[in-house]
Structure formats: C-alpha cells, structure tokens
Amino acid sequence: MITFLLFLLLGFVTNVLPADNTKAYTLTTLRKDYLKASKDEAAARLFYKKMADYNERHPVVLAYKGASEAVMAKYNWNPYNKLKHVKTAGSIFKEAVALDNANPEIRFLRFTVEHYIPRYLNLSEHLKEDKGVIIEGLKKHPHSGMPTDMAKTIRDFMLTKDHCTEAEKEVLRNIVL
C-alpha cells in the first residue's frame, strides 16, 4: 500500500512540476520562433516572453535572446521603447559574440538587426565585421557548425537587396551548400 502511494505521489509530482526548460531553447525551435516573430506581432511577444526567461550563457541562444529584443522594437510604437529594445539587443549580442566570436549564426542575427537600424542612430557599427564572419563561415560549411538549411537561409538573405557588394555576392553564389 505504501509503495502504491509512493508511485502515485511520484506520478503526481512529475505531472505537476514544470518540465526541464532546455527543450524550449533548442536551436531548431528558436530559428522557427524567430522567423514567426519577425512576421507577426503576437508571435514576437510570445518569443520575447520566452527568451526573457532565458538566463544561461549558450552563445547562440543568447543571440536569439538579443534578436527577441530587437524584434520587439519593430512592433513598439514608442520611440523611447524602440531604442531601449535595440540597445538591450546590442548588449546581448555583444555578450554572445564575446562567448563565440567566430560563429556565423550569431553574426548573422546581429547583422540582420543592425542592417535595419536607421544609420543616423549610429548603432550599426558591426556590419562589415559581421558580414566577413558570415561569408567565411559559409565558405567553411559544412564545417561551420551550422545545419545546411540554416546556411542556405543565411546565404539567400545575404544575396538579397544591398546586403553585400557584387563581388561578395559572386563569392556567395559559388558556395555549394
């Protein structure tokens, strides 16, 4: 009888206690969440709330936390709050880059944020440096640490608009992924 009660209690505790949060921060999930957040305000708010709870120091996950701050600036109407989110994102990106300065995914996230910040704010100081790391990371693929689908996403983004010079675009077009 006591054994039965212990098993019953154990079953209750495992169903009621919160599960381990690490699964919520898998890179595959974060990539999907960020893509949704960049297109939809409700998804952005959920992504921001989720990432606000992240307190570990995994460099790529930190970069997604920075991206969650930046995406909130997109949907915020108040200029002061927009700037606050962008500056917080910058601080988080700085920490992520310090932890892994050669990671092309971290640099890509920061590049995408800084590229869309108005130049007169002087908050886009890493574009050239980040672009160099991104291109070098793509050249090293599949030894860059990124899955092929992410590498393709990055390459495709870098080939659009004015993200790269024509010479850089030619290099990117010649990278086989």
Set out the residue ranges of the language-model regions.
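Terminal, low-structured helical/coil segments at or just beyond the last alpha-helical repeat
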Residues: 134-177
